[in-house]
Structure formats: structure tokens, C-alpha cells
Swiss-Prot record:
Known pathway: Amino-acid biosynthesis; L-arginine biosynthesis; N(2)-acetyl-L-ornithine from L-glutamate: step 3/4
Primary residence: cytoplasm
Protein name in UniProt: N-acetyl-gamma-glutamyl-phosphate reductase
One Pfam family cited in the UniProt record for this chain: Semialdhyde_dhC_1
Species for this entry: Lachnospira eligens (strain ATCC 27750 / DSM 3376 / VPI C15-48 / C15-B4)
Length: 348
């Protein structure tokens, strides 16, 4: 049985980790860390856990936690994991970090986009970027840190990766339009996220400055063998609880048919349990992935402008956060990737 500790257990992603791990036959949650709710019953914070979780929230003492668990999930704001981790902790346990602290390989890029001084740059090189469908061969029993990808980045990269890797699109022409439910902004109280502020409205935010941009550029840059890739990424907030829909546009680099594009997607995803490439002319919808670890992908060739339109949808709290983290844990401990994640999407 894998003993699990969660730091940041009372955030939305943390609660989703709890929900998923309760159904995992090989995992046991032994530590629910939360600075905001120390000594409070977890089920008082999240009533959906009443009679399911009989434990109190504890502090985020990573050094103590490392002595008690096999893996620590850090579902915390940027900067916290890097400020806590050290050699002694990593000699005792493994860390799956849901923040951005170890996703970017260039510490200067991290500090530029996140406006934070990185507290543990010595661990950046060894951290594995945990996009399982692309990087699973880099995860082994010796891996100490997994950088769980962001929600927008997971959707964007999985939607675009085969097209970039196979040279079907010109990567310099990529434009990504992304829309997310409000849970992506976290559980903290902010005026911008109040009901009256978001209901009956949509807005773009982080235009030209969103912090997931360099993460997408870095990973797609690896796909095309470049370190200078630049693209346009614009996220939008939509009035729903959860879900992300990405629509990406790029110029075609060569003449292709529907069958050519479909074959390229199938080359990478045909055997992937969690990636569903949809039938022709079927567009992804967030409602068909809600509550699940699935990613739905569709595409359309636009011959009038010689562009390819690529679409992807996932649940930002599951495949975009907690579900992918559990998938990474399964990889880390040699379990089937879909253990604890064989959950049908919720509808309605």
C-alpha cells in the first residue's frame, strides 16, 4: 500500500486528489495538510467527504511528512514546494508537485514569468515533466520529483503535439484560444471570482502574459527540436465550475488530407487510454469529460486559409491537475496508469 501525504489538501485540486485516491486500491491517505484549516475535520471543510474521510487537517511540515509517507503531493501555490524541499526529504520520499516550481527547465524563465525567486533551482534538472502520454519513459523508480503539468498546458500540448512532431503544421504560426471554468482560479476568495463578477460574462485575461505560455512553448519546442519557439496563447474565464476547451490554429506545413492528420494523431494516441481522438466532424465538449481523466481531441482542415484547426477538452481539476498527478504516481510505483482513474465522465 502506497502511503500518501497531500500538502494543500483543502484547495480544489487537493480535494480532487482526495476524491480520486479514496477509490485507489493501492493508496492510503495518511496526511491531509492545510495551513488554513489546521486541526479542523476535513469533512467539515468539504462536506462531500462526510463519512468518507475521518481525519483532521494538519500543518504542511514536509520534513515530518517525509518520514511517514512514500509520496507527497503538493497542491500549493507557486513557490511553496521549492521553499520546502531539500536533500533529506528527497532521500526519504518522492514528490509530485502540482505547482509550476519544477516545470520549466530555465530558472530565469520561471523567475521572469512567475515573478518569484526560485528557492531550489538545484532540483530543476532532475525533475521529470509529468505529461504521461509523452514523457512516461522518463519516469522510473529512481525519479524523485515529478513536475505535474498545468491544466491549460496539458490541453494545449496534447492537442498540438502530434501535429508539431510530425511537421504537419508550421509551429511559428500557432495561436491558442483557451477557455476555463472558474475552479481553475483556485479556491481563494477574490473579487474577480465572485458569482456576480463571472456569471453571465466571459473575459480574456493574462493576454500576452499568461504564465503557462513558456511551458507550452518549451514542450512543443522539444517536439520540433527548437528552443526558440514562440506562440500566442490567450486564456478566457467562462462561467462554469470546471472544464477547459482549447481551440488552436496553425498554418499547414504541407498538403494533407483528413486521413493524414488522423493517422498522425493515431500514431501517438491510438493506444492511450486517456486520450480520445473523436470521429470526423465531432468537436470536443467539456461536458463529455467532466469528472474524468480523459482528454477529447478533434480537428478540422480549413482549406480556404490553408490552416488546421485543432480542439481539445479536459477537466481542469482531473486530467489538468489531480488525475494526472495520480497517473504519475501510478507510473512512479509501477502500477497500471489507469488505476484509480477508470471513472466515466459525469453527465448531466
Amino acid at each position: 500500500m502506497i502511503k500518501v501525504g497531500i500538502i494543500g489538501a483543502t484547495g480544489y485540486a487537493g480535494n480532487e486528489l482526495v476524491r480520486l485516491l479514496l477509490g485507489h486500491k493501492d493508496a492510503e491517505i495518511v496526511w491531509l495538510g492545510s495551513r488554513s484549516y489546521i486541526d479542523q475535520n476535513y469533512s467539515d471543510v468539504y462536506r462531500n467527504m462526510f463519512k468518507l474521510v475521518d481525519a483532521k487537517c494538519m500543518d504542511d511540515n514536509m520534513e515530518q511528512l517525509a518520514n511517514e509517507v512514500d509520496v507527497i503531493f503538493t497542491a500549493t501555490p507557486q513557490g511553496l514546494c521549492a521553499s520546502l524541499v531539500n536533500d533529506e526529504i528527497l532521500s526519504k520520499t518522492k514528490i509530485i508537485d502540482l505547482s509550476a516550481d519544477f516545470r520549466l527547465k530555465d530558472v530565469n524563465v520561471y523567475e521572469q514569468w512567475y515573478k518569484l525567486e526560485h528557492k531550489a533551482p538545484q532540483y530543476i534538472d532532475e525533475a521529470v515533466y509529468g505529461l504521461c502520454e509523452i514523457n512516461r519513459d522518463k519516469v522510473s523508480k529512481d525519479t524523485r520529483i515529478i513536475a505535474n503539468p498545468g491544466c491549460y498546458t496539458t490541453t494545449s500540448i496534447l492537442t498540438l503535439y502530434p501535429m508539431v512532431k510530425e511537421g504537419i503544421i508550421n509551429p511559428d504560426t500557432i495561436i491558442i484560444d483557451a477557455k476555463s471554468g472558474t475552479s481553475g482560479a483556485g479556491r481563494g476568495a477574490k473579487v474577480a471570482n465572485l458569482f456576480c463578477e463571472v456569471n453571465e460574462s466571459m473575459k480574456a485575461y493574462g493576454v500576452g502574459t499568461h504564465r503557462h505560455t513558456p511551458e507550452i512553448e518549451e514542450q512543443l519546442g522539444y517536439a520540433c527540436g527548437r528552443d526558440d519557439l514562440k506562440l500566442i496563447f490567450t486564456p478566457h474565464l467562462v462561467p462554469m465550475n470546471r472544464g477547459i476547451l482549447v481551440t488552436a490554429y496553425a498554418n499547414l506545413a504541407k498538403d494533407v488530407t483528413y486521413e493524414d492528420v488522423k493517422a498522425a494523431y493515431d500514431k501517438y494516441y491510438d493506444k492511450e487510454y486517456f486520450v480520445r481522438v473523436l470521429p470526423k466532424d465531432v468537436c470536443p465538449e467539456t461536458r463529455w469529460v467532466e469528472g474524468s481523466n480523459f482528454v477529447d481531441i478533434g480537428f478540422k482542415i480549413e482549406p480556404r486559409t490553408n490552416r488546421l484547426i485543432m480542439m481539445g477538452a479536459l477537466d481542469n481539476l482531473v486530467k489538468g491537475a489531480a488525475g494526472q498527478a495520480v497517473q504519475n504516481m501510478n507510473l512512479l510505483f509501477g502500477l497500471p496508469e489507469n488505476e484509480g482513474l477508470q471513472i466515466a465522465p459525469m453527465f448531466p
